Amino acid sequence: MNEPPSSSTPNLTFNCGKCGEALQVPQSLVGTDVSCPKCQQVTVASTAQSPIPQTADANTTAFTDVTANTDENQSLEISTRLELNSVDALSAAETPTKILFNKITTEIGKLFVGQDELVIGTLVALFSSGHVLIESVPGLGKTLFVRTLGRVLGIPFGRIQFTADLMPSDITGAPMFDMKTQEFRFRPGPVFTQLLLADEINRSPAKTHAALLEIMQEFRVTIDGKSHALDRPFLVLATQNPIESEGTYNLPEAQLDRFMFKLMATYPEKDEEANILRLHSEQTDINERLENEVQTVTSVAEILSITQENSKIRVDEKLINYINEIVRKTREWPGFHLGASPRAGIALMQGARTLAAFYGRDYAVPDDVAQISLPTLRHRVILSAEAEVEGIGVDDLLTDLIRSVEVPRL
């Protein structure tokens, strides 16, 4: 992932469209809605006036200038970060979706520290009816995160530990003969939940992986010709270990494509790790803390309602062409042996809509697409043999690709 630039960046000065008040914002907010502190009028940040140079904080997050031309794209830092503070910085209005998003992240933060990409990416996938693949070393709190998320959302949580001898029926369930009724009765498997943690999914063979394909795409299980619907919302969070390769199986492309995002859980920062130690310094059972400290802030009905509302977020025709151009370039970009499928474009559009709703907007912008591009594409492309030999990373190639695409003026 790109680090924020440490060099100074100019601020942009423009006038409020209602009262004429001079407003000054970072260049990164060009094209976004800004609320005037004097009259509360919402005005689109415009480049009509020249920016006034000012030293920027080295920690300021860089975002794509939505009015940039092709030449300027070469020198811009495109934000591929999903950070909680960026959601607050770019918020346009206090909409019901944004209010709920803030409540959920606040409650999760009571027990789960850091990992902004994991938290935001999972919530975007949940409210887009998608699924998440998490690449992470052991011990970073994935199970705690899923349990906390289930508590906050008020939906049941299930966990499957994938092993080499795990059978499809161990996931989906199977018919069992009932001695009392002398009939076969379907015994549901652990997949019949709403928040499923598929731990170390790459330790099972392809036969077991195939059992998840229908579940993830159709939200149902078919046993002996009879379909059993899963309760909605339904979210699969699958994990794989990037270090240990012995005894693992590569996930087939068909299954990788079913995951909306591939998120990277990394080691926490120094301050975050210190906070983790403080949280666990009290010898209190985790179940007790979940019960007493974390509150349920939503319901199944509200989740489904907001998911439906997010599908109505406006996507301009120029933004559709922008998404299409990014996806199509992955198929011809040097360093990629296999590019992304049309399903990647659908995921980018759906994710951009949901992220825009989290920002409090009723329309999507190129920044929304840029921030979810890496999680959407990194597992859908395959490096060429030459790129692997040279040690070039997927994220590096994708970042260069995204920078090469002209950002539309909306």
Residue spans for each PLM region:
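C-terminal engagement/docking regions of AAA+ P-loop ATPases
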Residues: 330-410
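AAA+/SF3 P-loop NTPase mechanochemical coupling elements
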Residues: 185-194, 223-240, 251-260, 264, ...
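Conserved AAA+ ATPase core "coupling" helix
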Residues: 248-308
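Conserved AAA+/SF3 P-loop NTPase catalytic/coupling segment centered on the Walker-B
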Residues: 193-217, 246-256, 267-275
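Pre-Walker A (pre-P-loop) alpha-helix and adjacent loop at the N terminus of AAA/AAA+ ATPase modules
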Residues: 95-132, 137
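Conserved alpha-helical scaffold flanking the Walker A/P-loop in AAA+ ATPase domains
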Residues: 123-124, 177-197
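AAA+/P-loop NTPase substrate/partner-engagement loops
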Residues: 152-178
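Walker A/P-loop
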Residues: 127-162
